[in-house]
From Swiss-Prot:
Gene3D superfamilies: Peptide methionine sulphoxide reductase MsrA. This is Peptide methionine sulfoxide reductase MsrA 1. It catalyses: L-methionyl-[protein] + [thioredoxin]-disulfide + H2O = L-methionyl-(S)-S-oxide-[protein] + [thioredoxin]-dithiol; [thioredoxin]-disulfide + L-methionine + H2O = L-methionine (S)-S-oxide + [thioredoxin]-dithiol. The lineage of its organism: Bacteria, Bacillati, Cyanobacteriota, Cyanophyceae, Nostocales. Has an important function as a repair enzyme for proteins that have been inactivated by oxidation. Catalyzes the reversible oxidation-reduction of methionine sulfoxide in proteins to methionine.
Length: 163
């Protein structure tokens, strides 16, 4: 279930990123001004209607992702890309920290051609910046079917803090 953070009258846009375990990725993007709602789920695989255990088993091809609804009048897609590069190591293939497997891969799923172009330009800029010693392995792909994760995974860190 998506939790609305704010509301405006302007049309919202969507962005989808995979950068490791979706719990932390979602928590980082929820702090960004202009992000209206977030949800976590799965994208980019070949297995229909996967559950967490399916994805964890590495048989689905899906990545854990956060889907973001944002107000482009308050935050740009390029700003969201900057957060994406800041919150994970885009040079490790199918791994973030101790989490290993293709479900933890670094991936940007674009929703339109403007996002595709911005993602490619951003990746190239970060690569030549010298910020990372190794090559960036982040995939840039057109969005595919998004499968919402179960409620227990939504805003996971916020729920844990309330315990």
């Amino acid at each position: 279930m998506e939790l609305k953070i704010g509301s405006t009258e302007a049309p919202m846009e969507k962005a989808t990123f995979g950068a490791g375990c979706f719990w932390g990725v979602e928590a980082a993007f929820r702090k960004v001004k202009g992000v209206v709602s977030t949800s976590v789920g799965y994208m980019g695989g070949h297995f229909p209607n996967p559950c967490y255990l399916d994805v964890l088993s590495r048989i689905t091809g899906h990545a854990e992702v956060v889907q973001i609804e944002y107000d482009p009048q308050l935050v740009s897609y390029e700003d969201l890309l900057a957060v994406f590069w800041d919150i994970h190591d885009p040079t490790t293939l199918n791994r973030q920290g101790p989490d290993k497997g293709e479900q933890y891969r670094s991936v940007i799923f674009f929703h339109n051609e403007q996002q595709a172009e911005a993602a490619q330009q951003s990746k190239a800029k970060v690569q030549v910046s010298g910020r990372f010693e190794l090559d960036i392995v982040t995939e840039i792909k057109h969005k595919s079917e998004y499968y919402l994760a179960t409620e227990e995974h939504q805003q996971y860190f916020e729920k844990q803090a309330k315990r």
